[in-house]
């Protein structure tokens, strides 16, 4: 972010960075309001798929005339001008193909650990992974997704709980930060 900020400022632009706690809707809305009050002309946002945030994006574009670009996670049903990021469904499909190649099993059990439900990028990865695994390994059981809020300690507790319950677990698919907690 610092590098991109510097590049924009080299061209005479001004960049204001407002960090919020991951998944915190209230902080996101407050930051958006403060940025509007600061007179911004455009907003780059990693959105949360929450009705209030989606409405605020539309308000920014329609009422305030502030262009909004979403990054990393998309919210298609808004007035944002574009999305910059990966095809998360395809990323999930690719992960399923790699998982299948690594496991080389016709059946097994796979746990899924993700960040938060309201991050569309993460939920799209899960969808792509599960959909592809059903096609290429229909006998593989995919457990219900558990959420670690991208926290290593929570991820570690979830992993321990999963391993205690499923002694024959084949793999864990993790879509977010928290990998240290899963692997340690």
Residue ranges, per PLM feature:
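Short, ordered loop/turn segments at secondary-structure junctions
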Residues: 20, 48, 72-75, 115
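Flexible loop/hinge segments that line or gate small-molecule binding clefts
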Residues: 51-90
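Hydrophobic alpha-helical
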Residues: 41-61, 129, 143-184
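Short beta-strand segments enriched in small/hydrophobic residues
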Residues: 2, 81-82, 109-118
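Short helix-capping segments at alpha-helix termini
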Residues: 7-11, 63-64, 133-140, 165-167
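Amphipathic helical "hinge" segments at domain boundaries
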Residues: 1-30
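Hydrophobic alpha-helical segments within soluble ligand-binding/sensing domains
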Residues: 83-109, 155-156
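Short, surface-exposed alpha-helical segments at coil->helix boundaries
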Residues: 29, 89, 93, 122-130
């Amino acid at each position: 972010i610092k590098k991109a900020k510097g590049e924009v400022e080299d061209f005479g632009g001004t960049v204001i960075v407002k960090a919020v706690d991951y998944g915190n809707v209230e902080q996101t809305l407050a930051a958006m309001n403060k940025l509007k009050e600061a007179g911004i002309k455009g907003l780059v946002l990693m959105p949360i798929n929450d009705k209030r945030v989606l409405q605020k994006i539309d308000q920014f574009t329609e009422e305030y005339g502030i262009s909004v670009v979403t990054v990393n996670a998309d919210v298609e049903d808004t007035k944002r001008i574009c999305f910059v990021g990966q095809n998360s469904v395809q990323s999930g499909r690719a992960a399923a193909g790699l998982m299948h190649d690594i496991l080389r099993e016709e059946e097994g059990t796979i746990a899924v650990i993700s960040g938060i439900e309201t991050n569309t990028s993460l939920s799209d990865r899960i969808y792509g992974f599960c959909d592809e695994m059903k096609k290429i390994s229909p006998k593989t059981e995919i457990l219900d997704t558990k959420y670690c809020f991208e926290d290593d300690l929570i991820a570690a507790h979830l992993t321990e709980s999963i391993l205690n319950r499923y002694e024959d677990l084949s793999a864990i698919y993790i879509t977010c930060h928290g990998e240290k907690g899963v692997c340690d």
